[in-house]
């Protein structure tokens, strides 16, 4: 792979055409060697069939149908992405295919070793032979796995399309209700004007108030109707879509069996208690009433009398509680037990 400098980045190394003079020029690369060639040179050199790479000292046989547009500026990243796509298409097992997590981790490690060797040119022939051998031995399993994944992707695409239609239906209902509300307001306004033209001046305020109340009642009623309609649409969507049912079942299962290494963000039943006087009294009174049932910390006691610390919200109990938390947190944490 050739390292490019900034000056030759926008110039074809074969025909020396510059992108400044030809703004529509596109560069193509071939996964065989990842040398950058402009599109016109590819058409000129490889239209009649396979030909060697025009780069000096390369000589790899390239085919026109293998050329593609460069996506990443760094060709090293481009090469690694292509290798990962190829290897993941062959080693396409997931965690569901393994009974033990350790076996799955070993499988992932072996896949990463293959990618690393191919990307860095380490034992290329041996790695390629092992890759081809595995593909030939597990061809049926690979095809079955690809079919299952394509089915999942198809279900996901259908689910996304249904979600889009659901949103469109909600927007359509909302717009229709807004149009009807505007028509109702115009009708109320016209009726109010007709009544005011024939009513006495004493009754005009009552008519205006009554009209405003009717509009408010109508608005609140329409909001409730809109909420009911949207909830009905959501229920119909959830009941008719199998993908959403599966996602909801997985979510419910995750909610039923939570796992956190420290039992959540707090312990409801702590393994320690404050001494009675410290727990009840304020931080300023702890040291004055210190006795047998208290714990006296000379340094912290001085800070408890400092107005600068107290003004910032610091309290002596907070310091004691933090020290005890650091001492006791995690002592009763058994990860294997929590997982089960």
From Swiss-Prot:
Superkingdom of this protein's organism: Eukaryota
Coiled-coil region(s): 124-206
UniProt GO cellular component terms: transcription factor TFIIK complex
Family annotation (Gene3D superfamilies): Zinc/RING finger domain, C3HC4 (zinc finger)
MF (Gene Ontology): cyclin-dependent protein serine/threonine kinase activator activity; zinc ion binding
Protein keywords: Coiled coil, Metal-binding, Nucleus, Transcription, Transcription regulation, Zinc, Zinc-finger
Major localisation: nucleus
Cross-referenced PROSITE patterns: ZF_RING_1, ZF_RING_2
GO annotation, biological process: nucleotide-excision repair; regulation of transcription by RNA polymerase II
Location(s), subcellular: Nucleus
Zinc finger region(s), RING-type: 12-57
Function summary: Acts as a component of the general transcription and DNA repair factor IIH (TFIIH or factor B), which is essential for both basal and activated transcription, and is involved in nucleotide excision repair (NER) of damaged DNA. TFIIH as CTD kinase activity and DNA-dependent ATPase activity, and is essential for polymerase II transcription.
NCBIfam families: cdk7
Protein name per the record: RNA polymerase II transcription factor B subunit 3
Organism: Debaryomyces hansenii (strain ATCC 36239 / CBS 767 / BCRC 21394 / JCM 1990 / NBRC 0083 / IGC 2968)
